[in-house]
Amino acid sequence: MARTPLIAGNWKMNLDHLQAVATVQKLAFALPKEYYEKVDVAVTVPFTDLRSVQTLIEGDKLAITYGAQDVSQHEAGAYTGEISAQMLAKLGCTWVVVGHSERREYHGESSELVAVKAKAALNQGISPIVCVGEPLEIREAGTHVEYVVEQTRASLAGLTADDLAKTVIAYEPVWAIGTGKVASAADAQEVCAAIRNLIIELAGKEVAEGLRILYGGSVKAETVAEIVGQPDVDGGLVGGASLDGEAFAKLAANAATVVD
């Protein structure tokens, strides 16, 4: 089954709502229409940018999707500072990132919590981008494949085959995020293939062949084509390189070159 690559920008805590509009406009202007037939392009933005991005994308009928970077596990109630999946759905979000290593490290989020957040998003028709990845010491010990497979299993607990068919998984080796270090294409393929084999076990071959697995971790325009060209890598979760609309457009265009 041919999987359309997904190139998703994760802006993290960058760009206010005015900068967000300018960045998406630049991205849309810089990426010719024919590329949208080859790759899906998305941005996951700070909560405060969502309404502005929604208005721009819907008003100009842009072929770009968008989403948030986190979601509450709760539906509603006395949870100060939290944002529910229903709120995100009302803002037209297609995606929400859950389990990013920065959430796991700085906010103590467990894989069990990540799974509950993913289910909360799915219940509102939002596709979760579930992030997994190993720290440097695990990579150096040579146990990274087993580590990531078990982390993925725990982060998908309670999700049905139908849920998994609407889910995206992003493999982000923690040692490569924001460091300039990039896993080789072979490294990315090794882990992404193991993740796909896990999905076969959990949900069957048909779901596994349709599910998109992204690579994240210092993805650049110069490296994206080789990585996305791997048989089990279906796009990228792009951090810093997505903050400039024109640069992100170039990266997406380069990813499209591997699509037949």
UniProtKB/Swiss-Prot annotation:
Asked if the Swiss-Prot or TrEMBL record annotates the protein with the keyword Isomerase, the reply is: yes
Question: What's its EC?
Answer: 5.3.1.1
BP-aspect Gene Ontology terms? gluconeogenesis; glyceraldehyde-3-phosphate biosynthetic process; glycerol catabolic process; glycolytic process
Annotated substrate binding sites: N10, W11, K12, G178, S218, G239, G240
Q: Kindly state one GO CC term assigned in the UniProt record.
A: cytosol
List UniProt keywords, sorted A-Z: Cytoplasm, Gluconeogenesis, Glycolysis, Isomerase
Q: Where is the active site?
A: H100 (electrophile), E172 (proton acceptor)
Q: Does the keyword Isomerase apply?
A: yes
Q: In which pathway does it act?
A: Carbohydrate biosynthesis; gluconeogenesis; Carbohydrate degradation; glycolysis; D-glyceraldehyde 3-phosphate from glycerone phosphate: step 1/1
Intracellular or extracellular location(s): Cytoplasm
PROSITE patterns tied to this protein = TIM_1, TIM_2
Q: What class of enzyme is it?
A: isomerase
Q: For this protein, what reaction is catalysed?
A: D-glyceraldehyde 3-phosphate = dihydroxyacetone phosphate
- UniProt GO MF annotations: triose-phosphate isomerase activity
Q: Which family does it belong to?
A: Belongs to the triosephosphate isomerase family.
Q: How does it assemble?
A: Homodimer.
Q: What does this protein do?
A: Involved in the gluconeogenesis. Catalyzes stereospecifically the conversion of dihydroxyacetone phosphate (DHAP) to D-glyceraldehyde-3-phosphate (G3P).
- What protein does this entry describe? Triosephosphate isomerase
Species per Swiss-Prot/TrEMBL record: Corynebacterium diphtheriae (strain ATCC 700971 / NCTC 13129 / Biotype gravis)
Phylogenetic classification of the source organism: Bacteria, Bacillati, Actinomycetota, Actinomycetes, Mycobacteriales
Q: Which gene encodes it?
A: tpiA
